[in-house]
């Protein structure tokens, strides 16, 4: 099995439309070309849905990063941007953390951020971010739907985009879980 497939076998999408911020994730867990589970939960909420995070990559690594992020968020008084930067610095410089194979999207009312093991904290343009093997499909669909004149809600755009990604990416499925930042 390729390490690249192990790292990126999922789809996580986050978007903001008007005042609504949605993070969506598919439910498929794959190992190589085998589906191990179709209803995994890849999203976690922090501070009563004020901060939501989703991960792509190794499940154990993603959960370890959630714990580290949650500790940083508490340490820095729920300042997501500072917490993300501090986590990224630790992730890049710590001998143990550097080996973690995952990416994260985190969002609150003010920021949508992509965090990588390279120490990157990226705030994407156009209020849309996606990671994982189906990420580019979901990102493209969401950006297209958001650029059209329509009455679709953030939830509807996220669901349509995730379903398009699931149709195109063999490592993603249509068992979509969505969370809304409050």
UniProtKB/Swiss-Prot annotation:
| Any Gene Ontology biological process | proteolysis involved in protein catabolic process
Q: How is its activity regulated?
A: Allosterically activated by HslU binding.
Q: Name one GO cellular component term.
A: proteasome core complex
Q: Does the keyword Hydrolase apply?
A: yes
Give the GO molecular function terms.
Answer: metal ion binding; threonine-type endopeptidase activity
**Where does the chain bind Na(+)?**
166, 169, 172
Q: Which Pfam families match?
A: Proteasome (PF00227)
Catalytic positions are: 10
| Assembly | A double ring-shaped homohexamer of HslV is capped on each side by a ring-shaped HslU homohexamer. The assembly of the HslU/HslV complex is dependent on binding of ATP.
Which NCBIfam families does this chain map to?
A: ATP_dep_HslV, PRK05456.1
Give the family from UniProt: Belongs to the peptidase T1B family. HslV subfamily.
- The name of this protein is ATP-dependent protease subunit HslV
Which species is the source of this protein? Rickettsia canadensis (strain McKiel)
Q: Which gene encodes it?
A: hslV
């Amino acid at each position: 099995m390729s390490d690249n497939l192990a790292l990126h076998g999922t789809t996580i999408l986050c978007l903001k439309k008007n005042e609504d911020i949605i993070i969506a994730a598919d439910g498929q867990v794959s190992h190589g070309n085998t589906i191990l589970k179709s209803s995994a939960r890849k999203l976690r909420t922090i501070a009563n849905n004020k901060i939501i995070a989703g991960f792509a990559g190794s499940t154990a690594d993603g959960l370890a990063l959630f714990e580290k992020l949650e500790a940083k968020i508490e340490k820095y008084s729920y300042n997501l941007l500072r917490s993300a930067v501090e986590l990224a610095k630790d992730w890049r410089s710590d001998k143990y953390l550097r080996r973690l194979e995952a990416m994260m999207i985190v969002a609150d009312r003010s920021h949508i951020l992509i965090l990588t093991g390279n120490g990157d904290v990226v705030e994407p343009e156009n209020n849309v971010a996606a990671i994982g093997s189906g990420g580019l499909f979901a990102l493209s669909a969401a950006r297209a739907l958001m650029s059209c004149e329509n009455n679709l809600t953030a939830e509807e755009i996220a669901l349509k985009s995730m379903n398009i990604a699931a149709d195109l990416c063999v490592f993603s499925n249509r068992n979509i879980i969505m969370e809304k930042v409050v």
